[in-house]
């Protein structure tokens, strides 16, 4: 029962997290391209200096919503994965390849958590601050253009870090193929000679 419960939590959390990260990673370029092709005009952002940039702002807002939802999924699934990884050594077979793979999975999880934390705490605030500065100073090209450059660079870094998290989670999936139930050995009956 313990093995099944731990594995259920592990696989649900890992697959949900990996799928969510992959969805955001694949959908962000599609959102940007589709909105850019339709060339919208945002009525609340009035500036003659933002010719052609309304689509970037709208697409950025859509992707921001996706990334904020992804953060919630990362926190919940990351917590469940941590609990499952702590419980796994007590319920899985750690002989031969199992022990090494458990260590690799834990290392990949910690690396993915560190990258996601860095993105959340250090990169994402730069994305939002530079976007706000760009919109607030749209009529001042000397301020708006460097803010747009910072926004684009921070957003690219954000997507690259999201891709790194996806790669680390894929590594966890690949190193999970060795997870097995512990073998139960029944003692062999002793033979008595007649």
Short names for language-model regions:
Residues 15-22, 108-121:
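Hydrophobic alpha-helical membrane-insertion segments
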Residues 2-96, 135-138, 145-148, 184-194:
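Interfacial loop at the N-terminal end of multi-pass membrane proteins
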Residues 10, 97-109:
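Hydrophobic alpha-helical transmembrane segments
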Residues 120-136:
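Functional transmembrane-helix hotspots
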Residues 66, 146-166:
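Individual transmembrane alpha-helices with interfacial aromatic-anchor signatures
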Residues 116-123, 159-169:
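Alpha-helical transmembrane segments of helical membrane proteins, especially in multi-pass transport
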Residues 77, 84, 162-179:
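Alpha-helical transmembrane segments and their membrane-interface junctions
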């Amino acid at each position: 029962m313990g093995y099944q419960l731990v594995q259920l939590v592990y696989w649900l959390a890992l697959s949900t997290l990996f799928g969510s990260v992959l969805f955001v990673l694949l959908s962000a370029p599609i959102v940007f391209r589709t909105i850019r092709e339709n060339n919208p005009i945002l009525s609340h952002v009035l500036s003659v200096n933002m010719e052609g940039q309304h689509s970037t702002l709208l697409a950025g807002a859509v992707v921001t919503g996706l990334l904020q939802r992804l953060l919630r999924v990362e926190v919940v699934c990351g917590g469940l994965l941590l609990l499952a990884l702590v419980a796994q050594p007590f319920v899985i077979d750690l002989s031969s390849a199992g022990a090494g793979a458990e260590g690799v999975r834990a290392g990949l999880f910690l690396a993915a958590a560190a990258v996601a934390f860095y993105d959340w705490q250090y990169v994402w605030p730069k994305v939002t601050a530079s976007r706000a500065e760009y919109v607030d100073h749209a009529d001042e090209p000397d301020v708006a253009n460097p803010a747009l450059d910072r926004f684009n660079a921070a957003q690219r870094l954000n997507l690259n870090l999201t891709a790194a998290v996806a790669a680390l989670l894929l590594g966890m999936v690949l190193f999970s193929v060795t997870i097995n139930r512990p073998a139960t050995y029944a003692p062999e009956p002793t033979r008595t000679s007649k």
